[in-house]
């Protein structure tokens, strides 16, 4: 089944909003029990790969980082796939590098080699899945899941902003 341009545009917009909300947005929205926004208001580059597994305060922290970053870029790889898994993986690498650079420039999180590796791997997984079968149903599923997660997340951010202003 052919994917309509409107669905494709909607999916790209939702994926971009999702990636930015959970990367740059972490510096502005706290999620109790998962992360504190203040801890991400930092301008730091971490170039040592996989060191994050040694520096977390909770045992599940590195696993949350690993699987969260993989999951974040699977839809990006799926949507970006056209003809080549390798080209799509390179695109995902550049997209991740852009996000990490934005985090550094905006002092909105750690610019981390692990994130670059895990995001690119997530993009590779998404591209590989799309190379096997790309369907409108999968795109609608990505959109629905992203919206279901984004709405409460952004509502939490709006509540924190209102509390800050008051």
Residue ranges and their predicted role:
Residues 1-107, 128-166:
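Bulky hydrophobic segments
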Residues 107-133:
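Alpha-helical transmembrane segments that form the membrane-embedded catalytic/substrate-binding core
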